[in-house]
């Protein structure tokens, strides 16, 4: 990699050039003047920052905290987020193909060069558990990310996982699965992993790994082989149960083993396969004993004799259950019996925490949203995690309370709690937040940032002073980009600046991200580079496609669509958004047709979000435009 490219990629320019003082915020003078008045007073009310993404809401909150609290601003400022680190391994299924990747790979697939913390996902599945604790695939609806400065490395007996202290891991208690913060676990705690036999439908083509040399990886098609073939392959690779391999291959093989019914452990030298004396048959003893006690207290003594190192085997529990007359059980005892039966038949087992380290970190951390249960497996060996996006009711009731109870540092009169994208809070979470705001009004001030203030409940709006952040004008974005380019020694054409303004749509954060990504190529930035980097088509190309569809040349419109998808690597939702953007500026489309076109675009965007085939839906959208063109032209 060239020296210039290394320098460009070293620090995200969004952070490097983020304003540190209120006076440096771009083109929000009406906001800045009001905030400076609070600094002069040394006090402030609760605030609601409302406006489009990338207009300075987060920056304004950070600048306000710096000027109010000085060197102690970090101690007195809480920004809520929680996720796993970028290099955390995860097994996914994308378009029917099973892949062992990292969250950094998911970032490149779905965020690309776009800014933001959320992206909708329609073609991705991850491993989770069903209500019987059996491992299964489940659809992902969103990929979530944010930046973190500290992470927690959890050393397990089978491998490691890195996550923020606020990320939730799943544990087992007598009521079933329960989410707890990673910061609450300690040496000797038990997390949940799995060993299961998952059969896949093989895709065509591909090769199978037959060796584990330094440059190899387990091929994607290997995960799709029949279970018995995978097991035989693992036996052939293993020497006395150990496969010496690189770190990546070791993790590949560990996951391959786990979905093939073989227990695996990642070690410094490779991966160890466990054929006998499996911890994969063990459950945490404490919740199991409590459940057994509900059946019959005498059975507890029988089961305790099987407990070792805080765990008990599923077989021992099964033997105890065989002596229970289930027909005569009622109420709580019957529920306990059902839970125990579910556990002994489940794929999950207890994995012990051996050590924990807090580490410095500078980068994105991630989460996925899994509709239905919000649980997913990730790690060197799979660990059951819970989506910990911090705008949920649990954080409102716990983390905010804990932070609010501590004394402000540096003689400050209050602390600031910043909730970004607060319009994504559930109504229950907002009601909880309202009560917290009332309870800690003396010690804390809240800043809520939202794209849409209308999504914030009235009781919260009435407790806040509202600041409206306006969409940044093109001139302000261009001026900022020119200064950054000059500071970094990057040459950029005027056409390229226009292109960045177009793709960023008033979002300064995205504009700077696109500039940095384009600069990494190490040459003068022109408009071709910008559109390619941003995975965005030129507006005239989209208008040409719409023109042909509207005027009856469906085949040509279809050809142009496929060119856009191939040349720019655009997603279906990207295409739909650009079509929506361009139809308003096309003189040939009569004004009375616009509402019908907008309605059609909305229909097809919804279908894509729901997971429909992209090409089919995009071609169907062109067909709808074609039909409307015929209707309005009298054809």
From Swiss-Prot:
Keyword tags: ATP-binding, Autocatalytic cleavage, DNA replication, Nucleotide-binding, Protein splicing
Gene name as annotated: rfcS
UniProt-listed CDD domains: AAA, Hint, HLD_clamp_RFC
Protein function: Part of the RFC clamp loader complex which loads the PCNA sliding clamp onto DNA.
PTM (free text): This protein undergoes a protein self splicing that involves a post-translational excision of the intervening region (intein) followed by peptide ligation.
Family matches, as InterPro entries: AAA+_ATPase, ATPase_AAA_core, DNA_pol3_clamp-load_cplx_C, DNA_Rep/Repair_Clamp_Loader, Hint_dom_C, Hint_dom_N, Hint_dom_sf, INTEIN
Family in the record: Belongs to the activator 1 small subunits family. RfcS subfamily.
Binding site for ATP: 51-58
Superkingdom of the source species: Archaea
NCBIfam families xref list: intein_Cterm, intein_Nterm, PRK00440.1
Assembly, per entry: Heteromultimer composed of small subunits (RfcS) and large subunits (RfcL).
Protein name as it appears in the record: Replication factor C small subunit
Gene Ontology annotations of biological process type: DNA repair; DNA-templated DNA replication; intein-mediated protein splicing
GO cellular component: DNA replication factor C complex
Pfam families, sorted: AAA, DNA_pol3_delta2, Intein_splicing, RCF1-5-like_lid, Rep_fac_C
An example molecular function term from Gene Ontology annotations: DNA binding
